[in-house]
Each structure stands twice: as structure tokens, then as C-alpha cells.
């Protein structure tokens, strides 16, 4: 005898079990939206493998598996992003000789600049990018990049003139 499960049976099963499964999935993730996504993914996975809708233990195990997969994926993504950020920071950060007093002053002055000006200044001087390339990288126009660069230079000049 063949066990035929209709689309309607799956809808009824989902509507009955989803609230409890979302609550179960919620213990693994921070948001209800993530928990709902996990339950939906688990139902799809469960349905594709043609498991019996009566096997609720396996359905909960599938929800747990999907949740743990999501957590592992998020950890791997965070690790990759942190490594990429470190690589970018090392490749774009200006290198100062902190034994040299003038360079130490320059480093301090650059650190005092607003972030928008500092990133343009670093990209222009230390990484030798054009204003067009800077604009593309930061999602701003090249004129805005040039303007921020001018403001940064003016602020540095003002800082050094006042120290003399």
C-alpha cells in the first residue's frame, strides 16, 4: 500500500507544527525571522526527501540540523569578513615611523581627521588611488572625494601651522 501525501496534508502539517518548530528553532538564533526561515527550510528539506509527515522526531532533528548549519555558516562568514577587514586595514593603513617625531605628529593629526576625510586621504596618498577610484570604492562621486581630500589637507595644514 502506497503512502500518498497530498499538498493539502503538508499545508495542514505545517500550520499545526510550525509554531512549535519556530519556538524550538528560536533557541538557536537571535531573531524570530531567522527561526521562521529555519523552519521553512527544514520543511522543504523534509518534503524533498519524502519523509513521512508522521515522523515528527525527524522533523525536529531536521530543524535542529538546519539551525546548526546556519550558525556554522554565520561563524565562517564572520571569520572571513574579519580576516578580510584585517587584510584591508594592513594594506591601506599608512605606515609611520613612530621613532620620528614629525611622523608621530602626522599620525596623530591624521587620526584626528573625520573618518570620511581620513579614508580619502589614506586612499589618495598612501594607496595612490585616483579620485574616480576612491569615489567608486566609497560609493561617492569623484568630486566629493576630491572635496574631502582638500578638507583633510586643510585640516592637517591648520594643525601643523598652529603647532609651529
Briefly describe each language-model feature range.
Residues 1-23, 33, 47, 53, ...:
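A short, charge-rich alpha-helical start-of-domain segment used by transcription regulators
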Residues 77-107, 130:
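Internal acidic/polar
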Residues 37-44, 48, 54-65:
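Structural recognition of an alpha-helix C-terminal capping motif at a helix-to-coil junction
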Amino acid at each position: 500500500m502506497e503512502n500518498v501525501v497530498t499538498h493539502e496534508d503538508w499545508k495542514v502539517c505545517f500550520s499545526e507544527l510550525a509554531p512549535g518548530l519556530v519556538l524550538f528553532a528560536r533557541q538557536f538564533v537571535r531573531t524570530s525571522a531567522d527561526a521562521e526561515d529555519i523552519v521553512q527550510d527544514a520543511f522543504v528539506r523534509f518534503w524533498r526527501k519524502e519523509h513521512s509527515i508522521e515522523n515528527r522526531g525527524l522533523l525536529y532533528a531536521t530543524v535542529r540540523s538546519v539551525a546548526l548549519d546556519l550558525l556554522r555558516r554565520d561563524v565562517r562568514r564572520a571569520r572571513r569578513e574579519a580576516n578580510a577587514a584585517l587584510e584591508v586595514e594592513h594594506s591601506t593603513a599608512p605606515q609611520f615611523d613612530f621613532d620620528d617625531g614629525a611622523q608621530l605628529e602626522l599620525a596623530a593629526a591624521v587620526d584626528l581627521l573625520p573618518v570620511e576625510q581620513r579614508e580619502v586621504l589614506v586612499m589618495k596618498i598612501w594607496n595612490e588611488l585616483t579620485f574616480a577610484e576612491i569615489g567608486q570604492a566609497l560609493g561617492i562621486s569623484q568630486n566629493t572625494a576630491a572635496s574631502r581630500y582638500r578638507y583633510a589637507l586643510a585640516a592637517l595644514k591648520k594643525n601643523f601651522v598652529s603647532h609651529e
